UniProtKB/Swiss-Prot annotation:
Quaternary context: Homodimer.
Cellular-component GO terms for this entry: cytoplasm
Subcellular location: Cytoplasm
Protein name as annotated: 3-hydroxydecanoyl-[acyl-carrier-protein] dehydratase
EC number(s) from the headed UniProt entry: 4.2.1.59, 5.3.3.14
Catalytic residues identified in the record: 70
Length: 171
């Protein structure tokens, strides 16, 4: 069976309900925490490290939930949501590869914020470069990622780590 290399909003919502990779396997969060509208490219080859890459997008509009509360009179998308989106995508990549288990963010190395997402923006683009995947007691991916708004890079993260666990009871 040929793997799908792009995913629509409806595909991602199916993933949030556990319908894309099967019960007990990688899921994206449901809205409002789902920070991606589409994955435009996903591949196990290529990318900066030759281990795979993802490109995904989030459409921005002034009615998004976080603009009303972060901050009143000075609306800006919380930087942690962009970081979480990158973790979401690394976990999605592991599920897309066919690995079993539920995803958990395990940390990151250096994270830099040098721009912001305002309600006047149109589109956020996430670019994830897979550095390494490991399959042992747990399935683990390490990646680098960037967040861009309307074509301008505004965040970067090194050492994004996500693991898949067949049991999360003792995590």
């Amino acid at each position: 069976m040929t793997k799908q290399h792009a995913f629509t909003r409806e595909d991602l919502l199916r993933c949030s309900r556990g319908e894309l990779f099967g019960p007990g396997n990688a899921q994206l969060p449901a809205p409002n925490m789902l920070m991606v509208d589409r994955i435009t490219h996903i591949s196990e080859e290529g990318g900066k490290f030759g281990k795979g890459e993802l490109v995904a997008e989030l459409d921005i509009n002034p009615d998004l939930w976080f603009f009303a509360c972060h901050f009143e009179g000075d609306p800006v998308m919380p930087g942690c949501l962009g970081l979480d989106a990158m973790w979401q995508l690394v976990g999605f990549y592991l599920g897309w590869q066919g690995n079993p288990g539920r995803g958990r963010a395990l940390g990151s190395g250096e994270v830099k914020f040098f721009g912001q997402v305002l309600p006047t923006a149109k589109k956020v683009t996430y670019n994830i470069q897979i550095k390494r995947t490991m399959r042992g007691k747990l399935v683990l991916a390490i990646a680098e990622g960037t967040v861009s708004v309307d074509g301008r890079e505004i965040y970067s993260a090194e050492g994004l780590r996500v693991g898949l666990f067949t049991s999360t009871e003792n995590f």
